Amino acid sequence: MKLSRRDFMKANAAVAAAAAAGLTIPTVAKAVVGETTNAIKWDKAPCRFCGTGCGVLVGTQNGRIVASQGDPDSPVNRGLNCVKGYFLPKIMYGKDRLTQPLLRMKDGQYDKEGDFTPISWEKAFDIMELKFKNALKEKGPTAVGMFGSGQWTVWEGYAASKLLKAGFRSNNLDPNARHCMASSVVGFMRTFGMDEPMGCYDDIEEADAFVLWGSNMAEMHPILWSRMTSRRLTNEHVRIAVLSTFEHRSFELADNPIVFTPQTDLVIMNYIANYIIQNNAVDQGFLDRHVNFRRGATDIGYGLRPTHPLEKAAKNPGSDASEPMSFDDFKAFVAEYTLEKTAKMSGVPEDQLESLAQLYADPKVKLVSYWTMGFNQHTRGVWANNMCYNLHLLTGKISKPGSGPFSLTGQPSACGTAREVGTFSHRLPADMVVTNEKHRQIAETKWQLPAGTIPEKVGLHAVAQDRALKDGTLNAYWVMCNNNMQAGPNINEERMPGWRDPRNFIVVSDPYPTISALAADLILPTAMWVEKEGAYGNAERRTQFWRQQVPAPGEAKSDLWQMVEFAKRFKVEEVWPDELINKKPEYRGKTLYDVLFANNVVNKYPLSEIPADQLNDEARDFGFYIQKGLFEEYADFGRGHGHDLAPFDRYHQERGLRWPVVNGKETLWRYREGFDPFVPKGEDVRFYGKPDGKAVIFALPYEPAAESPDQEYDLWLSTGRVLEHWHTGSMTRRVPELHRAFPEAVLFIHPLDAKARGLRRGDKVKVISRRGEVISLVETRGRNRPPQGLVYMPFFDAAQLVNNLTLDATDPLSKETDFKKCAVKLARVVA
């Protein structure tokens, strides 16, 4: 049975009526399409795009997705979707969808300069096996690596961590979340000893004020923005402040719209801390019971190569050191950040700064701070996170309904996979780290490994992987579920040279021929979204499951299948030294698949637990319920330690649960008695990630950006996204409606800056940095309105690689790239 446009419109109308009446959508759909044998089947899934974690109902028929709706039973989005979410089915069916492995070949053999040629999976794994084994044999575990994703499912990330850190004994595993959430991770760990926000989306309906720091929620998290808009417009007392280096759509609702000079958010936060103290708005009792003060190391560099002049000049490059200080010391430290000084440095009028500070200082105002990439993609991103926590800790506005700091995520499982599973080069599951001997022992015990298997040295982070490929020390490299050739910084100087170096072999697993795929040596076709069973963890600690709903096209396979199947190619003797194998002689002759995935834990759940009519290609390929086995083994890391997850089967019944889940009950606000089961009675608040239960307020100064405009390169460049496209556009640009809505990137520029350079709206313009150049189109109107001296350009357009321009400077503590600040100049392109 086909669903006509008329029927689809009827279904939409019925869905709206059903939502109002409290009926479920599958019931309504049945009424619309009838009880025929090929009627549309509906099932739940979280959205494939940002970290909000909206619920979607997916309609399938005859092995294809034919419809989708916002899930009215989802507490996140309550039946709404953003414009990208409404077109989710179409991301699956681009005309250039990859359906078989492709290898660069010439005259029937692999050739680095050859043409992409279809091959079998067996031959694809043959060449991968050869290249990975050669790298391991010649240079050891540090010669292999993987760049993963905040779009991996929970068990894909967990399998990757086991394969790399245990199997290949290489910590050279990092996710693309390094580019977006690493500063938040380090900030949370530094202040609270545990990662991820303590609050939840319920704060939106409870708060009296919202402050957005470097977050354009209207376009990047539109469903949360709709909830905030409702809160603001239906409650006259509610206020919204928006801070950014340029005006954007979120400014349209702002009561206090603030445009500041890049990097001076650090100054503004220290001013607010000073204001709170000077106006006796400190919650002294809260500080005395729950907070310590520390002074952080300064002049820590910019995460550039050690030979860079800025790194040579830094006194404490990469230092995370700090020393105890008193409240009075902190008071003296922030005293220099006066209203007058802050206004002068930031360019923000004094009355706007004071109005902002009053929101934080007023004890009657419940306030939530939200931030995204403006804070995190920052050479002092960790400091920015710490300084925001300072404001909430000084006032006690934390860990309670309507008040708290909240880092919003940009990918669907940057939290659930990259952070919680621990696919960063320094992390293990449940906030454990490879540098901690006890943590390594815990992982080795749970994974049934010989003691000493997991290396203690931190592996290569995202930017360091690029540098190692260029330097020829990282030689076998697997990129999954991301498009880093387009998304990462400084493409020309630091990434492309390593990828095309004949010493290196690059594998890219992707559903589409992205810039990254086309720069690789081997492309593996990948199943996406509901073509596999999956789990994501969103920004409010909500873990959500979905079942496979359609088969993948052609020979496309999930990332999980690819990694687990590839593990069969390696015997332990080929990857582990004798001293390790001698500790577990029973592993001799076994493959990494046997040791890591057929270990009587991962493979203990039989296929009979999967309904006979339910798709699950991976499980049936391996002969056991692999997703359940991986999840339960992983979940054991956090249970009883404040990272508790519910049993696997519960998630298939729920619209997600926010961890820690204890005795079947989710946790909405962490660290607060009465909400968090890990806070002992009588303590009120306990930040139990720290041994003494106290959070840390850090004294940290303003330090300048790594690169600022000068006489030649006279403009700031900031990069980012637009509503219609997600990241590099590899999915959304294949949706005709989204592509037509915003077909190509433009350079947003102030009209006076354009006029001064002889440029008009629609002109072609060459944007030039010290690292490269790109041609774009001048846009002096529209949704983004930069101040004079700054231009803004989105990075979704593969024909305009804005990251040819960006600098690979990172936060020295989080290793996250600053995509928001570099210097450029413009030149008019004469037709």
Swiss-Prot record:
<dbReference type="Pfam" id="PF04879">
    <property type="entry name" value="Molybdop_Fe4S4"/>
</dbReference>
<feature type="binding site">
    <location>
        <begin position="719"/>
        <end position="728"/>
    </location>
    <ligand>
        <name>Mo-bis(molybdopterin guanine dinucleotide)</name>
    </ligand>
</feature>
<dbReference type="InterPro" id="IPR006656">
    <property type="entry name" value="Mopterin_OxRdtase"/>
</dbReference>
<feature type="binding site">
    <location>
        <position position="803"/>
    </location>
    <ligand>
        <name>Mo-bis(molybdopterin guanine dinucleotide)</name>
    </ligand>
</feature>
<feature type="binding site">
    <location>
        <position position="47"/>
    </location>
    <ligand>
        <name>[4Fe-4S] cluster</name>
    </ligand>
</feature>
<dbReference type="GO" id="GO:0042128">
    <property type="term" value="P:nitrate assimilation"/>
</dbReference>
<dbReference type="GO" id="GO:0005506">
    <property type="term" value="F:iron ion binding"/>
</dbReference>
<dbReference type="Pfam" id="PF00384">
    <property type="entry name" value="Molybdopterin"/>
</dbReference>
<dbReference type="Pfam" id="PF01568">
    <property type="entry name" value="Molydop_binding"/>
</dbReference>
<dbReference type="Pfam" id="PF10518">
    <property type="entry name" value="TAT_signal"/>
</dbReference>
<feature type="binding site">
    <location>
        <position position="483"/>
    </location>
    <ligand>
        <name>Mo-bis(molybdopterin guanine dinucleotide)</name>
    </ligand>
</feature>
<dbReference type="GO" id="GO:0016020">
    <property type="term" value="C:membrane"/>
</dbReference>
<feature type="binding site">
    <location>
        <position position="50"/>
    </location>
    <ligand>
        <name>[4Fe-4S] cluster</name>
    </ligand>
</feature>
<feature type="binding site">
    <location>
        <position position="176"/>
    </location>
    <ligand>
        <name>Mo-bis(molybdopterin guanine dinucleotide)</name>
    </ligand>
</feature>
<feature type="binding site">
    <location>
        <position position="820"/>
    </location>
    <ligand>
        <name>Mo-bis(molybdopterin guanine dinucleotide)</name>
    </ligand>
</feature>
<dbReference type="GO" id="GO:0045333">
    <property type="term" value="P:cellular respiration"/>
</dbReference>
<keyword id="KW-0408">Iron</keyword>
<comment type="function">
    <text>Catalytic subunit of the periplasmic nitrate reductase complex NapAB. Receives electrons from NapB and catalyzes the reduction of nitrate to nitrite.</text>
</comment>
<feature type="binding site">
    <location>
        <position position="82"/>
    </location>
    <ligand>
        <name>[4Fe-4S] cluster</name>
    </ligand>
</feature>
<keyword id="KW-0534">Nitrate assimilation</keyword>
<keyword id="KW-0500">Molybdenum</keyword>
<comment type="similarity">
    <text>Belongs to the prokaryotic molybdopterin-containing oxidoreductase family. NasA/NapA/NarB subfamily.</text>
</comment>
<feature type="binding site">
    <location>
        <position position="532"/>
    </location>
    <ligand>
        <name>Mo-bis(molybdopterin guanine dinucleotide)</name>
    </ligand>
</feature>
<feature type="binding site">
    <location>
        <position position="559"/>
    </location>
    <ligand>
        <name>Mo-bis(molybdopterin guanine dinucleotide)</name>
    </ligand>
</feature>
<feature type="signal peptide" description="Tat-type signal">
    <location>
        <begin position="1"/>
        <end position="31"/>
    </location>
</feature>
<feature type="binding site">
    <location>
        <begin position="213"/>
        <end position="220"/>
    </location>
    <ligand>
        <name>Mo-bis(molybdopterin guanine dinucleotide)</name>
    </ligand>
</feature>
<dbReference type="GO" id="GO:0006777">
    <property type="term" value="P:Mo-molybdopterin cofactor biosynthetic process"/>
</dbReference>
<dbReference type="GO" id="GO:0042597">
    <property type="term" value="C:periplasmic space"/>
</dbReference>
<dbReference type="InterPro" id="IPR009010">
    <property type="entry name" value="Asp_de-COase-like_dom_sf"/>
</dbReference>
<feature type="binding site">
    <location>
        <position position="377"/>
    </location>
    <ligand>
        <name>Mo-bis(molybdopterin guanine dinucleotide)</name>
    </ligand>
</feature>
<keyword id="KW-0574">Periplasm</keyword>
<feature type="binding site">
    <location>
        <position position="795"/>
    </location>
    <ligand>
        <name>substrate</name>
    </ligand>
</feature>
<keyword id="KW-0560">Oxidoreductase</keyword>
<feature type="binding site">
    <location>
        <position position="180"/>
    </location>
    <ligand>
        <name>Mo-bis(molybdopterin guanine dinucleotide)</name>
    </ligand>
</feature>
<dbReference type="GO" id="GO:0030151">
    <property type="term" value="F:molybdenum ion binding"/>
</dbReference>
<keyword id="KW-0004">4Fe-4S</keyword>
<dbReference type="GO" id="GO:0009055">
    <property type="term" value="F:electron transfer activity"/>
</dbReference>
<keyword id="KW-0813">Transport</keyword>
<feature type="binding site">
    <location>
        <position position="151"/>
    </location>
    <ligand>
        <name>Mo-bis(molybdopterin guanine dinucleotide)</name>
    </ligand>
</feature>
<dbReference type="GO" id="GO:0043546">
    <property type="term" value="F:molybdopterin cofactor binding"/>
</dbReference>
<dbReference type="InterPro" id="IPR041957">
    <property type="entry name" value="CT_Nitrate-R-NapA-like"/>
</dbReference>
<keyword id="KW-0249">Electron transport</keyword>
